[in-house]
């Protein structure tokens, strides 16, 4: 993917937003493309934040992490994910890193169930990344969410044969049940947790207004971290209060 294509894309986005007078003050830093599995991550993090235990389902969660080196590569990865056609429709997302205790800046993830699926998917994605973005873009397999590995370092171990490989602690099940019970009481028969706010309800082909507004936030983020590549994309980058607050 040539840099010129990304420059044209940003120009087109700006024209659409300006002509239609769309409010660019938007809260969002991630663009998802939903797969066949719904992970219920909001529920899992509620359990973790309350008790610092890792939910059972998260022990089979593996991700391919891709680390674009600049804002242009991040938008290229977004385009790759948009057209990515895998054997299974796996969830993927592009984002800018705003968590204070997590390293890195630009990231992409492909969600997998189990290490074997992650290894297989990485083999499939490697030539695609090489041909569309470049051979030097870092990519690797990680287990679950970074916060879990910080609280429980052995969780980061990928190899089940390693003595430090972490397995689910069965005593944590009661903690999960406590949160599930609380959530059921709160909603009283309604949908337990609505994760559709993270996704489009159906994956739409091509860029959406929501995508465009998140990309605007990415541009402001790039400016904040002094990524010089953002100057190639736009001379006027709208202010993002959502991103700015993340740096406080």
Predicted feature locations:
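Structured alpha/beta or helical-core interaction and ligand-binding surfaces enriched in interleaved
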Residues: 1-248
